[in-house]
């Protein structure tokens, strides 16, 4: 597995082009707007993940005021899933949804390491877009159950929080989930660049890269076309 590290900060945004090996003319482009806010475009659809208000660990960041066909959030906390920031069909609750040709499945997962007793449940997501399968675990610290692993499968693209703290996987936990799901591509999210804002309990991405152990690190530019290999995109 290769590790690709971007010189572009999360606030500046990272744009990726992911071709689909399974669908001629398929694939998606992914743009980062910091924290775990990603805009995924492809297959005639657009999906925005986790728009946030500039509070908590997102303090000082530009809010992603965008419009997409579907807006997915792991929770409705202001710094994770602010429904009034972005335009589009907003989904944050578990369930099966079909919107504009997209089939999306949301599953409840503990937001914390106490079975949800402290912060309740988050929603983890899976869907197909542009010939690629996605799993979005951007805001959970709960251990995956055997049923979760079956439902999520082996996604082409895994989006996972890695910055630690009370509601996000830490580096070792995130690396364990990557090994469990064995995705083709990994996009780590929800980590800080530079000094953490006051009161933010998250760290940077380097501990996650270290936890992945012995993988090569390559720096990306602002945009990149990527082959269908096992990669980590930052």
List where the protein language model places each region.
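Short N-terminal segments immediately surrounding and downstream of signal-peptide cleavage
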Residues: 26-41
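Active-site-proximal loop/helix segments of hydrolase catalytic cores
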Residues: 113-181
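Structural recognition of the beta-strand scaffold that forms the well-ordered cores
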Residues: 48-50, 72-73, 105-106, 133-137, ...
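Sec/Tat signal peptide C-region and signal peptidase I cleavage site
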Residues: 20-24
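Bacterial N-terminal signal peptides
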Residues: 9-18
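Pre-active-site segment of Zn-dependent metallo-hydrolases
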Residues: 37-94, 105-122, 140-151
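Histidine/acidic-residue-rich catalytic or RNA/ligand-binding cores of hydrolases
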Residues: 171-175, 196-208
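Conserved small/polar residues in nucleotide/adenosyl-binding loops
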Residues: 232-234
């Amino acid at each position: 597995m290769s590790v690709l590290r971007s010189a572009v900060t999360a606030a500046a945004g990272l744009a990726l082009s992911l071709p689909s090996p399974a669908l001629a003319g398929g694939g998606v482009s992914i743009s980062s707007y910091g924290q775990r806010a990603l805009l995924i475009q492809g297959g005639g659809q657009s999906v925005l993940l986790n728009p946030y208000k500039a509070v908590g660990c997102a303090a000082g960041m530009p809010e992603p005021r965008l419009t997409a066909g579907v807006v997915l959030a792991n929770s409705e906390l202001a710094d994770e899933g602010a429904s009034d920031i972005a335009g589009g069909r907003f989904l944050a609750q578990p369930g099966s949804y079909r919107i504009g040709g997209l089939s999306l499945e949301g599953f409840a997962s503990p937001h914390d390491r106490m079975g949800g007793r402290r912060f309740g449940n988050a929603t983890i997501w899976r869907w197909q877009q542009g010939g690629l399968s996605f799993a979005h675990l951007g805001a959970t610290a709960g251990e995956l159950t055997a049923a979760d692993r079956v439902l999520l499968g082996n996604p082409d693209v895994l989006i996972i929080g890695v910055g630690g703290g009370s509601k996000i996987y830490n580096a070792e936990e995130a690396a364990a989930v990557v090994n469990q799901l064995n995705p083709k591509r990994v996009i780590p999210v929800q980590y800080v660049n530079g000094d953490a804002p006051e009161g933010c309990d998250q760290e940077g991405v380097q501990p996650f890269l270290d936890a992945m152990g012995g993988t090569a690190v390559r720096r990306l530019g602002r945009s990149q076309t990527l082959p269908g290999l096992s990669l980590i995109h930052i």
